[in-house]
UniProtKB/Swiss-Prot annotation:
Outcome of gene disruption: Cells lacking this gene are unable to use L-ascorbate.
CDD domains from the UniProt entry: PTS_IIB_ascorbate (cd05563)
Record text about domains: The PTS EIIB type-2 domain is phosphorylated by phospho-EIIA on a cysteinyl residue. Then, it transfers the phosphoryl group to the sugar substrate concomitantly with the sugar uptake processed by the PTS EIIC type-2 domain.
Gene Ontology MF term list: kinase activity; protein-N(PI)-phosphohistidine-sugar phosphotransferase activity; protein-phosphocysteine-L-ascorbate-phosphotransferase system transporter activity
Name of this protein: Ascorbate-specific PTS system EIIB component
Gene Ontology CC terms: cytoplasm; transmembrane transporter complex
Species the sequence originates in: Escherichia coli (strain K12)
Amino acid sequence: MTVRILAVCGNGQGSSMIMKMKVDQFLTQSNIDHTVNSCAVGEYKSELSGADIIIASTHIAGEITVTGNKYVVGVRNMLSPADFGPKLLEVIKEHFPQDVK
């Protein structure tokens, strides 16, 4: 199985696209089976079926509601692997250990 990440920002164009690339690089280097997509906060509900983890800045993460086996990771600096990396890995290792190589 592959853990599916959705990067969310206010407009879905700038920050989430960069965050998508940073998360992809980080998870590839961490040997995690994954896919990463991005969208605007207003579109996240239509993208939930294809995501296991939603990653967003802390102020946007508070607006995101999920149910079931889906998780939201709020980060202060969504462009810094030093900030989002440990939080994201913690959720993956706890809830998606089969994706850690």
